[in-house]
Design a protein with these regions (language model features):
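N-terminal intrinsically disordered, cationic/polar leader segments
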Residues: 1-86, 91-139
Length: 139
């Protein structure tokens, strides 16, 4: 992975074999990001995404392997209990045009990933809501 920062914008290239969440965390830590939005596209060879079941208050994960194009990868970087926290969603399509997506648990790049991180001047933490079962923004 390589990246360059331009004021409040970080442009990154995540390389073949690298895992997306690990690389985003590395950038967040290196740049001391407290709040940011994330956008990306690229190609993945394997990924796991989840769908939150509100009645059960838990995610159900689905894993995929093969040639997939990232149709959309979006989300936020912020903090929870003082630690960096990344919340990303991803959709990826196969050669038949079928698209699979959800909350990103894991994604390994098969060719390249082009990412833009917009750093926001501020800080938003998270807290775990027992009622909802998710880590929500805390202002």
């Amino acid at each position: 992975m390589e990246y360059r920062r331009f004021d409040n914008t970080i442009v990154a290239r995540i390389d073949r074999g690298e895992e997306v969440l690990e690389q985003v965390a590395a950038i967040a830590q290196a740049e001391q990001i407290k709040l940011a939005s994330v956008q990306a596209l690229g190609a993945v060879g394997e990924f796991t995404v989840g769908v939150f079941h509100t009645a059960e208050k838990q995610y159900h994960a689905n894993s995929y392997a093969g040639d997939f194009e990232i149709v959309s990868l979006t989300g936020t970087i912020n903090t929870m209990d003082g630690a960096f926290y990344t919340h990303l969603h991803m959709s990826a399509g196969n050669e038949k045009g079928e698209v699979f997506g959800g909350h990103l648990n894991r994604a390994v790049i098969s060719a390249t990933c082009e990412m833009v991180i917009t750093v926001i001047d501020g800080r938003v933490d998270r807290f775990h809501s027992e009622e909802i079962g998710l880590n929500l923004f805390q202002f």
